[in-house]
Amino acid sequence: MNPNLAKVLLIDRDQERRNERISVLKQHGYKVFPALDLQQARSRCKPGAFDLIVVNSGGQPDMALELCEWIKSNDSKQAVLLIAATGNQLPHRDYIVSDVPKQLLDRIESLFKGVEVAVKAA
């Protein structure tokens, strides 16, 4: 997928990290839409509105997992990437452990490559 066309919802309460992640993703052509809290995230999560939703657990893994499950229950095809402090006991396949921006970018690009392959194979 062309990053210039990809819309990413970034849910992150930590202003410094959020700004850093937004900057890196925008530099690589992604359209980034920040959500600062759970309420704002839920109001923006409409089926098909985003190509990817990135959720930072921000020290609240239970709340982040609940949000991921809520997103998937509303749109089972929605790609969701969870950023967590630790990967222990996470039921999700698509997560990274407390990232640095390069790791986040690499993971997002690999997710979109997987989407392209799936679309081409269909």
Q: Residue spans of the language-model regions?
A:
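Conserved phosphotransfer microenvironments
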Residues: V54-S73, K77
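Short acidic, S/G/P-rich loop/turn micro-motifs used as interaction or catalytic elements
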Residues: D14-R17, Q39, V55-D62
